Amino acid sequence: MGKIIGIDLGTTNSCVAVMESGKPKVIENSEGARTTPSIVAYTEDGEILVGASAKRQAVTNPKNTLFAVKRLIGRRFNEEMVQRDIKMVPYTIIKADNNDAWIEVRGKKVAPPEVSAQVLMKMKKTAEDYLGEPVTEAVITVPAYFNDSQRQATKDAGRIAGLEVKRIINEPTAAALAFGMDKKEGDRKIAVYDLGGGTFDISIIEIAEVEGEHQFEVLATNGDTFLGGEDFDARIIEYLVDEFKKENGIDLKKDMLALQRLKDSAEKAKIELSSSQQTEVNLPYITADASGPKHLAVRITRAKLESLVEDLITRTVEPCRIAIKDAGIKISDIDDVILVGGQTRMPKVQEKVKEIFAKEPRKDVNPDEAVAVGAAIQGGVLQGAVKDVLLLDVTPLSLGIETLGGVMTKLIQKNTTIPTKANQVFSTADDNQTAVTIHVLQGEREMASGNKSLGQFNLADIPPAPRGMPQIEVTFDIDSNGILHVSAKDKATGKESKIKIQASSGLSEEEVQRMVKDAEAHAEEDHKAMELVTARNQCDAMIHSVQKTMKEHGDKLADEEKSKIESALKEAEDALKSGDKETIEAKTQALAEASHKLAEKMYSQGQGPQAGPGEEPSGQSGGTEKPVEGEVVDAEFEEVKNKK
């Protein structure tokens, strides 16, 4: 049975970990980094780049380099947050047929789960390379305050990436698992303050020893799914744009290339200002006008940055207060405050956390890795590799249905421990009503219109009766992933209608299947491309070897033999220009055979080690010779793309 990996699918960066010998291990990617930028780029020649390689080319390909896509996952196009993002990102956010926010790249419409799936595939490959075996199962984390549509969309992304998502768990809960696993200090209450690249969560969690078992119980959670490091970067970008406009009268917001360079610099400046008091943003040739090229040089102090983002930091205070109140505890009851997410490295954020909780936050948890580590531990729990751990998570928002007068009637209150089930009996609003529409909602507002619509379905064929007579039992069932299943049953007839909530938006089963097939086809393309590169490199090595040997020993051959080799060389060089693996392999083999005579001559004259462009000479056992040069594919070779 393969291992269940833990993936922190972040807005800005992602991370993967696995349980090994009873300990969680964060896995380094192919570039040697422990986190991978959650960036996906679509190149002109149809290649899809993920991670650092996508980030490196963002400046030259801004419209087709997608970052912070997690902020769009499970969201409608007309949501205020999405509209705000449209103004800030260089790529094109469009309205899909189902009213979701999708993205257009190189003339193709792409759903956010499809983009996130590319990041998950990179994480999957990272784990497979390390473990040396296929990985098919994962625990994926989401912000605690993600609603049902966003959780469902994240699960879809996992399926598209070829992963069976064994569990969706909340990021702060995962961080608490990472923090509390090795702590043997008895019962304690902790606050997890998670300010990441795109989302903010606060969870109050109780870690208790119950009959020798580590029990992690989430008491309350709150947050803001559109507040994070990306917003901090945006404030710096706005400031730089304003300063440049004051000085030069040019608005850089209209220049996609300049905007991408500003984004890079804003992120770097923000990071620098966590450890130094001031930094300078220098961007030569940022744009040009009739008078010539323009350069941007702006000094930013830590105090200036703090004034730019003060209101963003303040926005984290209210969710913290609500979570403490909902948990039914006092601030003084909290034993530890843990910081998660890269943005918590900012001194001003740490200061605010200290002010809210009246204690220094702990610094012994890695804010970038804790969530993936917790996901890996949960994977170990599900696999039975980690014993004596019980995780009790909650649903972040209340769930209910729309009733007469456009009111939301709640069936499950926020911060209810999951999995959970609740039912309530409703009736008809009109005489002889034969069908009812069950409109499922999520949120805290009294009126239905103020809450998130998760979907609706009908219960038909109700026998005609006076209003208020039929008894319709509505049941809400939340599974351990926090995903909702709803059913409605006419108690008189026993007729039942049920749905697994697939938001009125969201991807249909057919769309998910199509995307899974696309991803598989792409993986097959990558495999074929890799085989072609290998064939080209082997052919190039053979050509190089034969040419070298011909130069040194060609005079020992008869003219006929020489022209045979030269002809095979020419054919191999021509084959290299093609993109046909079979042709390249055939011509490589033909060249090896044609140069056979040359190899024989070299060996017979005691020149064996230098002469081997092709196969072993006849009569040799081959057991003790050095490797034949033409058969060695040097690791330094790169794909040879001869221009026609």
Swiss-Prot record:
Stretches the record annotates as Disordered: 589-644
Entry protein name: Chaperone protein DnaK
GO molecular function, one term: ATP-dependent protein folding chaperone
Entry-linked Gene3D superfamilies: 1.20.1270.10, 3.30.420.40, Actin, Chain A, domain 4, Substrate Binding Domain Of DNAk, Chain A, domain 1
Highest taxon, organism lineage: Bacteria
Purpose: Acts as a chaperone.
Taxon lineage: Bacteria, Pseudomonadati, Pseudomonadota, Betaproteobacteria, Nitrosomonadales
Pfam families named in the record: HSP70
Compositionally biased tracts (Low complexity): 604-619
Alphabetical keyword list: ATP-binding, Chaperone, Nucleotide-binding, Phosphoprotein, Stress response
Organism in which the protein naturally occurs: Nitrosospira multiformis (strain ATCC 25196 / NCIMB 11849 / C 71)
Induction description: By stress conditions e.g. heat shock.
Family the entry assigns: Belongs to the heat shock protein 70 family.
Location of Phosphothreonine modifications: T199
